[in-house]
Curated annotation (Swiss-Prot):
Identification of the protein by name: Cytidylate kinase
Keyword entries, A-Z: ATP-binding, Cytoplasm, Kinase, Nucleotide-binding, Transferase
Localization, UniProt: Cytoplasm
Catalytic activity: CMP + ATP = CDP + ADP; dCMP + ATP = dCDP + ADP
The organism's taxonomic lineage, starting at the top: Bacteria, Pseudomonadati, Pseudomonadota, Alphaproteobacteria, Hyphomicrobiales
Species of provenance: Rhizobium meliloti (strain 1021)
GO terms under biological process: pyrimidine nucleotide metabolic process
Listed GO CC annotations: cytoplasm
Length: 212
């Protein structure tokens, strides 16, 4: 059976960076499930299709190629806004969850990060992590990331956006953001990326040892 690591958490908590490091460490396949919603939204926008037609959005979601998700292209703010509109559609979520589960079966192992991996997509994952940080810390990270990339950023606007996204993610009727009961909580507010990685690695190593 494939070894699955589920990493959930709110926006800008550091789960993407952590997931990529873990996947690299163990030679596992990595999927940022948030990009699957963004890819669906971009496909709709590129085709000039409406973002409020659930049947059309579901059909588009079923045609998304998970092997060709380009983080740089899909990180555009307008795509993120569109993705948040289709992400609340149950039919779209069902279609993408099916694709994400199929990805999770890849050998020798997979790391999936998102909002509902440990609770909905892969409830039987060998390791479940819930990565979080205070809204202030997450907004500062996002702000610094944009500035480092040569962009202009307004901390207050980003902070408000982080809080808005938290409310939307946690208040969603279908698959709300919450830690799985058996998830290990990693608060990265005061943690470096390296410290978070080492904490996660300890948990993964222990689970791998149990599997053997």
């Amino acid at each position: 059976m494939t070894f699955v690591i589920a990493i959930d958490g709110p926006a800008a908590a550091g789960k993407g960076t952590l997931s990529r490091r873990i996947a690299e460490q163990y030679g596992f396949h990595h999927l940022d499930t948030g990009l699957t919603y963004r890819a669906t939204a971009k496909a709709l926008m590129d085709a000039g299709l409406p973002l409020d037609d659930e049947a059309v959005a579901e059909k588009t979601a079923r045609e998304v190629d998970l092997s060709g998700l380009d983080r740089a292209v899909l990180s555009e703010h307008s795509i993120g806004e569109a993705a948040s509109k289709i992400a609340v559609m149950p039919a779209v979520r069902r279609a993408l969850v099916e694709a994400q589960r199929a990805f999770a079966r890849k050998e020798p192992g997979t790391v999936l990060d998102g909002r509902d991996i440990g609770t909905v997509v892969c409830p039987d994952a060998a390791v479940k992590l819930y990565v979080t940080a205070s809204p202030e810390v997450r907004a500062k990270r996002r702000h610094d990331e944009i500035v480092a990339g040569g962009g202009k950023a307004d901390y207050t606007a980003i902070f408000e956006d982080v809080k808005k996204r938290d409310g939307r993610d946690m208040g969603r009727a279908d698959s709300p953001l919450r830690p799985a009961e058996d998830a290990h909580l990693l608060d990265t507010s005061e943690m470096s990326i390296e410290a978070a990685f080492q904490a996660a690695k300890t948990l993964v190593d222990a689970a791998l040892k149990e599997k053997i």
